[in-house]
Amino acid sequence: MLYKKLRSQGNFRKNDSAYFKLENKRELKGDNLPVEEKVRQTIEKFKDDVSEIRRLADDSDFGCNGKETGGAMHIVCFFQKNYDWMKGQWQN
Protein backbone atom coordinates (compact mmCIF):
# COMPACT_ATOMS: atom_id res chain seq x y z
CA MET A 1 0.00 0.00 0.00
CA LEU A 2 1.14 3.49 -0.77
CA TYR A 3 0.30 4.57 2.77
CA LYS A 4 2.59 1.93 4.32
CA LYS A 5 5.46 3.05 2.11
CA LEU A 6 4.98 6.70 3.06
CA ARG A 7 4.50 5.84 6.72
CA SER A 8 7.75 3.86 6.76
CA GLN A 9 9.45 7.05 5.61
CA GLY A 10 7.91 8.91 8.57
CA ASN A 11 5.41 10.93 6.54
CA PHE A 12 2.25 9.89 8.41
CA ARG A 13 1.16 8.59 11.77
CA LYS A 14 -1.54 5.93 11.65
CA ASN A 15 -4.12 8.28 13.15
CA ASP A 16 -3.46 11.11 10.71
CA SER A 17 -6.48 12.11 8.69
CA ALA A 18 -4.14 12.24 5.70
CA TYR A 19 -3.99 8.43 5.84
CA PHE A 20 -7.69 8.00 5.15
CA LYS A 21 -7.79 10.80 2.60
CA LEU A 22 -4.78 9.41 0.73
CA GLU A 23 -6.11 5.87 0.61
CA ASN A 24 -9.55 6.93 -0.58
CA LYS A 25 -8.24 9.35 -3.18
CA ARG A 26 -6.04 6.61 -4.55
CA GLU A 27 -8.80 4.02 -4.65
CA LEU A 28 -11.92 6.08 -5.35
CA LYS A 29 -10.79 9.21 -7.21
CA GLY A 30 -12.43 9.99 -10.50
CA ASP A 31 -14.72 7.00 -10.63
CA ASN A 32 -17.99 8.98 -10.35
CA LEU A 33 -19.51 6.22 -8.24
CA PRO A 34 -22.48 7.07 -6.06
CA VAL A 35 -21.68 7.70 -2.40
CA GLU A 36 -23.36 4.43 -1.43
CA GLU A 37 -20.94 2.47 -3.62
CA LYS A 38 -17.94 4.33 -2.19
CA VAL A 39 -19.21 3.52 1.30
CA ARG A 40 -19.66 -0.13 0.33
CA GLN A 41 -16.12 -0.31 -1.04
CA THR A 42 -14.69 1.29 2.07
CA ILE A 43 -16.66 -1.00 4.38
CA GLU A 44 -15.37 -3.97 2.40
CA LYS A 45 -11.81 -2.67 2.69
CA PHE A 46 -11.97 -2.34 6.48
CA LYS A 47 -14.56 -5.01 7.35
CA ASP A 48 -12.07 -7.14 9.27
CA ASP A 49 -11.00 -4.23 11.46
CA VAL A 50 -14.03 -2.74 13.20
CA SER A 51 -11.73 -0.74 15.48
CA GLU A 52 -10.25 1.01 12.43
CA ILE A 53 -13.72 1.98 11.21
CA ARG A 54 -14.62 3.24 14.68
CA ARG A 55 -11.37 5.21 14.91
CA LEU A 56 -11.99 6.81 11.54
CA ALA A 57 -15.54 7.71 12.54
CA ASP A 58 -14.35 9.20 15.84
CA ASP A 59 -11.40 11.10 14.36
CA SER A 60 -11.92 14.74 15.29
CA ASP A 61 -10.30 15.81 12.01
CA PHE A 62 -13.35 14.45 10.18
CA GLY A 63 -16.19 16.62 11.46
CA CYS A 64 -19.38 16.51 9.41
CA ASN A 65 -19.73 20.26 9.21
CA GLY A 66 -21.36 20.47 5.80
CA LYS A 67 -18.41 22.37 4.31
CA GLU A 68 -16.50 19.32 3.08
CA THR A 69 -17.81 17.70 -0.08
CA GLY A 70 -15.15 15.10 -0.90
CA GLY A 71 -15.90 11.39 -1.08
CA ALA A 72 -13.94 10.62 2.08
CA MET A 73 -16.01 13.11 4.07
CA HIS A 74 -19.26 11.54 2.89
CA ILE A 75 -17.98 8.13 3.88
CA VAL A 76 -16.89 9.25 7.34
CA CYS A 77 -20.19 11.07 7.93
CA PHE A 78 -21.94 7.86 6.93
CA PHE A 79 -19.78 5.96 9.45
CA GLN A 80 -20.62 8.41 12.21
CA LYS A 81 -24.36 8.15 11.56
CA ASN A 82 -24.56 4.41 10.82
CA TYR A 83 -21.84 2.72 12.86
CA ASP A 84 -24.17 0.38 14.77
CA TRP A 85 -25.96 -0.65 11.57
CA MET A 86 -22.65 -1.37 9.80
CA LYS A 87 -21.38 -3.39 12.75
CA GLY A 88 -24.53 -5.52 12.51
CA GLN A 89 -23.98 -6.05 8.78
CA TRP A 90 -20.49 -7.45 9.38
CA GLN A 91 -21.82 -9.93 11.92
CA ASN A 92 -24.43 -11.31 9.48
From Swiss-Prot:
The organism's place on the tree of life at top rank: Eukaryota
- What is the name of this protein? 11 kDa excretory-secretory protein
**Which organism's genome codes for this protein?**
Trichostrongylus colubriformis (Black scour worm)
